[in-house]
C-alpha cells in the first residue's frame, strides 16, 4: 500500500475523530511523551558550560531516536501506520480550538481571552477584541503549517520515521527553541533544524492558501511580509492568510508584560476584526485540508497509473 494512500486514510481519520477526550484523558498522547523526554534532557543537561554543544547532542539523540522508533513502528503494518499518522495530525483539533475562540468572542471578551490563551503563548489578559481575533487567526495559519501540512509532507517523504522526526524536532523547538538566557544556546540546534524541516511545508501552505483565495496578485506583498517576519517560516502562511481575509495580522503584542512591536503583516488590511474573520479563517483551514487531501489522492492515482 502506497504511503500516499496511507496518508489519505490518516487525514480522513483525523478529520473525523480528532483527539477524543475519552481516549487521551486515559492515555499519554505521543506528543506529550516526546515532551516528557525533552523535559528530562533539559533538566539534566541544560546547565553549566558548553550548552550549545550539549544542545546539538540532545537534538542529534532526539533525531536518531525518532527515526529509529519510526522504523520499528513501521514494522507493525499499514493499519498501525494510519493510526499513528492520524494521531500526529491536528486538523480537527486545530479547527476546533480556533472556532472556540470565535464562539467565546460572541459571548464575552473575558471568555474569549481565556479561550485564546489555550492556543497562544502571548499575554491575553488585556487583549481587545481585534487582538484576540488576530491571535487566533495567526495561530490558525502557523499551526496549519506546523500541525497539518508539515507532518503530512514528512510522512509522504519518509513514512513514520520522517513523521516522528518532524514531530519530535518541532516539539523540541516549541519547548527549548527560545532566544532567552536559558535556551539561546541549548535550544539553538533544535530551533535551526525545525526551521529547516519547515522550510518547504510553510511555503506549500502559503501556496495552497494563495491558490484557494485567488491571491496571486498579492504575491509580491506576501513575499515581502514573509521576509520581514520574525520567523523564517511562519510568516509565509500568515501573510497568505492575511491577504486571503483582507486583514492585518501581527503588530504589537505583549509577552510576559513586555510590549513587542512586531512588523504588521498586510498593514493595509482591516485591523478592526472579530469572530466573523475567525470563522472565515476556520473555513479556509478546511479548504486547505481538502486541497491537501485531493493532492494526496492525485499522487495515489498517478502511482496506480505509472
From Swiss-Prot:
Gene Ontology cellular component annotations, sorted alphabetically: plasma membrane
Into which family does the record put it?
A: Belongs to the CobD/CbiB family.
Its GO biological process annotations read: cobalamin biosynthetic process
Pathway the protein takes part in: Cofactor biosynthesis; adenosylcobalamin biosynthesis
**Segments passing through the bilayer:** 69-89, 146-166, 286-306
Q: Which UniProt keywords apply?
A: Cell membrane, Cobalamin biosynthesis, Membrane, Transmembrane, Transmembrane helix
Where in the cell does this protein reside? Answer: Cell membrane
State the name under which the record lists this protein.
Cobalamin biosynthesis protein CobD
Keyword Cell membrane listed? The answer is yes
Q: What task does this protein carry out? A: Converts cobyric acid to cobinamide by the addition of aminopropanol on the F carboxylic group.
Molecular function in Gene Ontology:
ABC-type vitamin B12 transporter activity; threonine-phosphate decarboxylase activity
Q: Which domain of life is it from?
A: Bacteria
Chief localization class? membrane
Membrane association type: Multi-pass membrane protein
Source organism = Ruegeria pomeroyi (strain ATCC 700808 / DSM 15171 / DSS-3) (Silicibacter pomeroyi)
